[in-house]
Amino acid sequence: MNGKSVTVTMRVTSMGNTLMHEMRGADRPDDPITMFVVDGDRVLLTHYCDADNRPRMAGTLSPDGKTLDFNFLDVTGNMKYGHMQHATFTFIDANHHVEDWTFQMPGDKPMHAHFDLQRTK
C-alpha cells in the first residue's frame, strides 16, 4: 500500500473450517485480522478492523474461479471512523494473488487499497 511493504499470513484454523488472514506492516500499530468461513453455498468474511468494528461480507466467485468478490452485509462496533465496505481477491496462480479493499469513510467517501501479493518461502 502506497509502495510500502506488508506481510500477509494466511492459515487454516478451527479444525479446517476457517481461514485466518493477518496483515502486518512495519509502520502499522496493529494487525487487522480477517476470518473466512464457508456458510452453505457462500463464503463469508468478518474483518476485525483497527477502526474498532467488525464488518461482514458475502463472497461471490466468478465463473472462471479466478475472482472472489465480497459485498457488504452488516457491521458491528464503532462507526466513527468508517468501515470496510468491499473486498476483491483475484487469484493469479498458486503463489500469487491480488487484493483490493474499499474502506468507506464518514460521509460515504471511499478509500481504496491495492495489494499485489506473492508467496515467499
Description of each model-found segment:
Residues 1-121:
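Hydrophobic small-molecule pocket/channel-lining residues, especially in calycin-type beta-barrels
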